[in-house]
Amino acid sequence: MIKQRTLKQGIKVTGVGLHSGNKVTLNLRPAAANTGVVYCRTDLNPPVSFPADAKAVRDTMLCTALVNDEGVRISTVEHLNAALAGLGIDNIIIEVDAPEIPIMDGSASPFVYLLLDAGIEEQDAPKKFIRVKKKVRVEDGDKWAEILPYNGFRLNFTIDFNHPAITKNLSTYTLDFSAQKFVQQISRARTFAFMKDIEYLQSQGLALGGSLDNAIVLDNYRVLNEEGLRFKDELVRHKMLDSIGDLFMCGYNMIGEFKAYKSGHGLNNKLLRALLEDQEAWEFATFEDKEKVPQGYTVGAQVLI
């Protein structure tokens, strides 16, 4: 039986909030089987919890934010969510003492290594996957995203920026997902921004924690980070990282093929909602026989390093 996963022990880290620029403490704790992914604002009295749910995503400007009916929010959840998806963690309590998850280095890699440091253990309950049964597609102008049946988890993403540093041959990336490929090829890809946008955002009191330490920054001609890029196509890899995190907002790993052109957090969430709302488009899948598990989900997270 393919089993659910949680952490062996809790682990804590401190970082900076991307938008506030303030110190943020993040505490990751194990959770019982069938708990799911639960985000919790511990700075509020009483604390406010947000179970991972596509419908809880109500703000996708610049990041993915969970907002409840009272307007309480947790922003910038997508990179941590991607790390959970990449390692196949089903049950976890995520406590944060601020309205946003710390940005760390702008990628999912710090979260991956935090989770691996805490340790991952299997639980005595079958792991549930969402298996796509028919194609679902959403569009917004020339942007689109779709998910189709596929026996595994494959992703194809294309970006399109009119910028000399983002050439056509660096604008498309395809991944046949596995935990190991996620860690090695996707998790280290950092978020990116253009200098003109950062200056505007900071003038509006946003992105106050943004810097060359936690983002790739481009002017009109080049990448400004002295160390350059971690991959030649790091930008499109990061958009794929975002998509993995956004699709995991349902709390289950996907069995299907995701394709997107110029998609972002909003369109990714629109696709996930459209899929889940169509009862004929998906089903839950569990696997008693490990031999029948789709390619990419067969290797345990313990074999990553």
From Swiss-Prot:
<dbReference type="GO" id="GO:0016020">
    <property type="term" value="C:membrane"/>
</dbReference>
<keyword id="KW-0862">Zinc</keyword>
<keyword id="KW-0479">Metal-binding</keyword>
<keyword id="KW-0444">Lipid biosynthesis</keyword>
<dbReference type="InterPro" id="IPR004463">
    <property type="entry name" value="UDP-acyl_GlcNac_deAcase"/>
</dbReference>
<keyword id="KW-0443">Lipid metabolism</keyword>
<keyword id="KW-0441">Lipid A biosynthesis</keyword>
<dbReference type="InterPro" id="IPR011334">
    <property type="entry name" value="UDP-acyl_GlcNac_deAcase_C"/>
</dbReference>
<dbReference type="InterPro" id="IPR015870">
    <property type="entry name" value="UDP-acyl_N-AcGlcN_deAcase_N"/>
</dbReference>
<dbReference type="Pfam" id="PF03331">
    <property type="entry name" value="LpxC"/>
</dbReference>
<feature type="binding site">
    <location>
        <position position="238"/>
    </location>
    <ligand>
        <name>Zn(2+)</name>
    </ligand>
</feature>
<comment type="function">
    <text>Catalyzes the hydrolysis of UDP-3-O-myristoyl-N-acetylglucosamine to form UDP-3-O-myristoylglucosamine and acetate, the committed step in lipid A biosynthesis.</text>
</comment>
<feature type="binding site">
    <location>
        <position position="79"/>
    </location>
    <ligand>
        <name>Zn(2+)</name>
    </ligand>
</feature>
<dbReference type="GO" id="GO:0046872">
    <property type="term" value="F:metal ion binding"/>
</dbReference>
<keyword id="KW-0378">Hydrolase</keyword>
<feature type="active site" description="Proton donor">
    <location>
        <position position="265"/>
    </location>
</feature>
<comment type="similarity">
    <text>Belongs to the LpxC family.</text>
</comment>
<comment type="pathway">
    <text>Glycolipid biosynthesis; lipid IV(A) biosynthesis; lipid IV(A) from (3R)-3-hydroxytetradecanoyl-[acyl-carrier-protein] and UDP-N-acetyl-alpha-D-glucosamine: step 2/6.</text>
</comment>
<dbReference type="GO" id="GO:0103117">
    <property type="term" value="F:UDP-3-O-acyl-N-acetylglucosamine deacetylase activity"/>
</dbReference>
<dbReference type="InterPro" id="IPR020568">
    <property type="entry name" value="Ribosomal_Su5_D2-typ_SF"/>
</dbReference>
<protein>
    <recommendedName>
        <fullName>UDP-3-O-acyl-N-acetylglucosamine deacetylase</fullName>
        <ecNumber>3.5.1.108</ecNumber>
    </recommendedName>
</protein>
<dbReference type="GO" id="GO:0009245">
    <property type="term" value="P:lipid A biosynthetic process"/>
</dbReference>
<feature type="binding site">
    <location>
        <position position="242"/>
    </location>
    <ligand>
        <name>Zn(2+)</name>
    </ligand>
</feature>
